């Protein structure tokens, strides 16, 4: 029995690079697809948002002289590329998917609407939401919060390369300790960088809990859905 009935899974674009320095690692992509298939077979309704940092990040583009709006639009296109790649990988495993885009770009994907997404998930499709919110100046984390709230997900699962939220960056501070659970207010107070402030506030105000875990370890997504405590639970 799965712990959650409907989830919004947020995946990092940079994680798709695997051991590469750019682009999509077919091995990592395949591992993600296998994990998603496992959970889908448990009867879980799945919505997914993938970042685009493995291809282009609007904010870093702006620091190099790109117009910020155009840079963010390039980042949106990067998320569409990643979404199509994941859709293809899932399709190869026999999982039905729909790529829904925040801006019109048929026939690459269908234009997003809440009702279309929920209907598709209830019919057994994995929905992949791409192009962020469709507007510049919003991160894919904010896009994930928005989509998670809209589709009435039970939780946002934030798959990262670390196994939860720590008192400090564990890659820089060996004394950092992990939280089993933490409130939104404590995240604010401690100044922890779980997501950007807009994304975190949206989740808090709309009672969407977040679970942060390491998606790069094969089998972890299923463990989360089975109720194993392998990450950090963020709640009101």
Each model region followed by its residue ranges:
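C-terminal catalytic "cap/lid" subdomain
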Residues: 1-236
């Amino acid at each position: 029995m799965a712990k959650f009935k409907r989830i919004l899974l947020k995946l990092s674009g940079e994680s798709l690079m695997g051991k590469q320095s750019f682009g999509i690692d077919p091995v990592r992509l395949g591992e993600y697809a296998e994990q998603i298939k496992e959970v889908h077979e448990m009867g879980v309704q799945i919505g997914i948002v993938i970042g685009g940092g493995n291809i282009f990040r609007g904010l870093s583009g702006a620091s190099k002289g790109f117009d910020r709006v155009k840079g963010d639009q390039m980042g949106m296109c990067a998320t569409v590329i990643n979404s199509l790649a994941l859709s293809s990988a899932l399709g190869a495993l026999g999982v039905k998917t729909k790529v829904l885009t925040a801006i019109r770009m048929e026939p690459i994907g269908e234009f997003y609407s809440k009702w279309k997404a929920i209907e598709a998930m209830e019919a057994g499709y994995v929905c992949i939401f791409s192009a962020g919110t469709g507007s510049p100046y919003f991160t894919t984390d904010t896009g994930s919060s928005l989509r998670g709230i809209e589709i009435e997900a039970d939780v946002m699962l934030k798959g990262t390369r670390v196994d939860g939220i720590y008192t400090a960056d564990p890659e820089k501070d060996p004394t950092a300790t992990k939280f089993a659970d933490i409130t939104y207010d404590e995240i604010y107070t401690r100044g922890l960088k779980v997501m950007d402030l807009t994304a975190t506030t949206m989740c808090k105000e709309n009672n969407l809990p977040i679970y942060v875990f390491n998606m790069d370890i094969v089998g972890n997504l299923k463990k989360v859905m089975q109720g194993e405590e392998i990450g950090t639970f963020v709640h009101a």
